Structures are given as structure tokens and as C-alpha cells.
Amino acid sequence: MTKQEEIIKEIILAARKIQDFLWGEPNKNWGLEEWKRMFRKRIVKIDDIDPANPHAVIELKKRLLQNAALSVALLIRLDNGLPGKENVDVVPSNLPEYAD
């Protein structure tokens, strides 16, 4: 593993710890639709990055790391089974604008 890959790995692991600290309990209660909304929101934010912005690459890396942290959180959640509809109303969505 290159030094850069090692750093990226450490960042993703740290992001996962932060994600779990902030959202550990709600993660257990969100249904699959809420997870989809979270990913849609990140994709919209990636689409909104202006390539002319001198900080576009940094912004893209930040958004990709957020997606990586979400992916890891969902992978861990999947160890307990697929989040189902039974969880949909437990925690109200804070991302209703990203619903299907």
C-alpha cells in the first residue's frame, strides 16, 4: 500500500468513527429509503461542484470521503440484515427532498 493509500485508509476509518459517534443510534433505526436519501444528497453535492473552482478537487475528495463513511456505516448496518420498512417512521427523515 502506498503512503497516500494508507492515509486515505486512515481517513476513511476516522470518518467512520466520527459517523458512528454522530449517528450510531439513528443508524440502527433508519430504513433503506433514508440511506438512499443520504447517498442521493451526496451525489447532488458532487454534481454541484464547479470545476472552475480552484478548490474543486478538495471539495470532491471531501464528498467522496463522506460517501465512503456512509458506505462503511451501511455495510456494518447490513450485518444485522437489510434495513426494512419497519424502521421508516422510527426516526423522521431530515432529507425529505431526496425521496424518490
Q: Residues of each region from the PLM?
A:
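Flexible "arm" and connector segments at domain edges
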Residues: M1-D100
